[in-house]
Amino acid sequence: MATTRLLAIAVASGRVGSVFMIGDTLTYWQVSVKAAESPVEAAAHAQTLINGFWPDVIVTEEPNAVRHKGAETLALIAAMARVAEDCDLLDVQVPRVQRFPNKYAEAEALALRYPELAPWKPHKRRFYQAEPRNTVLFEALALADFMLNNRGE
């Protein structure tokens, strides 16, 4: 059986995070601010990633299960999912399951499983600070991890 090439993309306010995995091995990760500017930029970003990595599967957040994202963010997710569909790729939309008390605990657990991302682990913020830029990277990794751990269910 061939090893699955998986591209997971997450969108947060003003940022798009993506991770690329071959099997269970994390090989690439990126945070883009430009991709979050508009659905056109998001689609172009997704197309660039697809052209560069040739994934078998693209994982995005399931829009119907999202309660905490605005209309602009949902439009970005939809634009990237359309690109996957246009490229005849399997676009798996998974719910963003929060298995930890907060994003920082989740990032800590994911950094233990994928130590190559440990330097990008976001630190807990104070209430008056903006959300750390790299949280979206760990959201993308959580989507990929959810997909990998729930195959065949």
Write out the residue ranges for each language-model feature.
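Phosphate- and other anionic-substrate recognition elements at nucleic-acid/protein interfaces
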Residues: 1-153
